Amino acid sequence: PLNKDGSICEPEAEKMLDTAIASGVTYIIDTAYPYHNGDSEPFLGRVLKKYDREDFFLATKLPVWNVNTLDDTKRLFQEQLDRLQVEYVDFYLLHCLNKEKWQKVLDLGLIPYFEEMKAEGKIRYFGFSFHDDYEVFETIAMGFLSDSV
């Protein structure tokens, strides 16, 4: 639920999340760093901290367009964990990949870094969301498969 200005209507959104969790819904959260002008992750962190982390599945995404170095990526990933007030995310995606962003992922060495985060237990499943031609999708998918992500 949103307010008239497009911001999150926090009381209503919290009530909706509480109802979903009380009703047994476990996969309820799909967010990303820029959602709702950057307010989605902090809001969810505040609301979800009252629940056991194992009670829900959480997905968020790296805004690849906002990183220019591996250090940017590391900082942003940690910031997302902090904003969400969690030690790990269930599903972590490279957001809105296309041909140019995929090349950036390769150039910056992001996949080995996120494999390391998986090994450390900070990410359970790693993947990508996609916005380009099918041939580019195949290239990205094969890149993920060859790296055993």
Model-derived segments and spans:
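N-terminal binding-site loop/beta-alpha segment at the start of enzyme catalytic domains
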Residues: 1-55, 113, 119
